[in-house]
Structures are given as structure tokens and as C-alpha cells.
């Protein structure tokens, strides 16, 4: 009987996490890395997503100083390995991140960043320097019936929409998309859960805007951040607002205030 109960609980545990499985880049649907199917495929698959181990999070011991926070925990003990593939998308396009069935109770923000590869993304790490510029975020919005962004994801067919800046210069970029789960965090600085993924894209168009200096990952997410990471999420409200980590959002009109 105990064994049966244990097996019945397995799907619940597995479904408690997730990852981006497909991405609409404008009108182009692109398959992302599947950590459960792609490693065994022959010949090896070459996708735009930097490979990660599984559907679990980057947690306390890794996100502050390890390059696991850059693009997730890698396969075979190596994090943030560039891939050779990219996918083209026009500046200003709508991007739709299609997550696996995100039904878990992980209240927190959803954030999206860009990093300019300064050439080929296959030759760019992103683990050092202030290269990550946030282009979109949603945290806690008390005007919505479901205030936390990540808890709205299941109500949107596990799909999250972000529009690329329309004035950005063409070139190769890393598009980094992330959920932060605050369900187990506390003011002592324990148990934050990050779910990042990195996708190599080639932005096309005639824009001239260059990304400004942004944040470093690792580096910007800190153990002493009691406003964004280590807090009691139940205390957040209309009168006690929440600010996601990673700084302000940048777009066609510069930095948002």
C-alpha cells in the first residue's frame, strides 16, 4: 500500500516543475531543448536552446555565484555550453514561450532578458560581465484576479508573450527567459527557485539601438536581497508592492522608470 501511494505521488512531483518546450518567434515555431528526449537522439539534435539537465530549478547554492544561473544547470556537470544553432526573428516581433504544463503553485515573477553576443553566440558565454538586459517583466499585479505572474501562466495555456524591441540592431543575441518561484523562500535567505533557459536568436531588421550595460548573471541575484528574492511572498499586497530582481526594463524608449 505504501508503495502504491508513493507511485501515485510521482506525477505530482514531476509536474511541480517545468521548462520552455517550444517558442514562437514571430510566425516561426521552434522546438526548444527537451532534456528527457533529446539527449538520446541519433544523430544528435542541434537546437537553439543551451542544454540543461532537467525540469528542476537552480536553487540557493548555485544561483548566487555559479554559472548555473546564467542558462540553467547544464548536462554532464557543465553549465551554459553554447550551441551552434540560431533562429531568425525580426526586431519588434512577438515571442511566445510555450512552457510544459505549468500547474504548480510557484508564485513569483516572470522575466526575460537579452544579451548581445557581439558576433556569434556559439562563441559567447554570457557568464561574465554586465551583459544581461531585461526587456520584460511581470511580478505581482494587485489589479489582476491572479496577481502573481507565474500563477497566471497556467491560465494562459502555459504560454507567455514578450515583444522584442523594434529598434534593436540586427545581430545574434541570447534570449533568456525565467521564472522565479518564491513559494518556499523566507527572510532568512533560503529556498529560492529559478527556472532560466537561454535561446540563441538572430534578430533581423534595420534598427540601430544597441543594448546598454545590464546586469551580470551570476552576480546580480544576491542572498541579501530581501525585496525581490528572500521574502515572505504572502506579505506582498497592493500596499506592500513587489519588485522583481534584475533591475529595470529596457526597451525602445530606453529604461522604464
Residue ranges with predicted function:
Residues 2-110, 117-159, 182-257:
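Peripheral, solvent-exposed domain-edge segments
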Residues 93, 171-172:
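Surface-exposed loop/turn positions
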Residues 114-116, 166, 179:
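Short, structured patches in soluble enzyme cores that scaffold and shape functional sites
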Residues 164, 169-171:
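A glycine-anchored, Pro-Gly-centered beta-turn/N-cap motif
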Residues 173-177:
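A short tyrosine-centered beta-strand micro-motif
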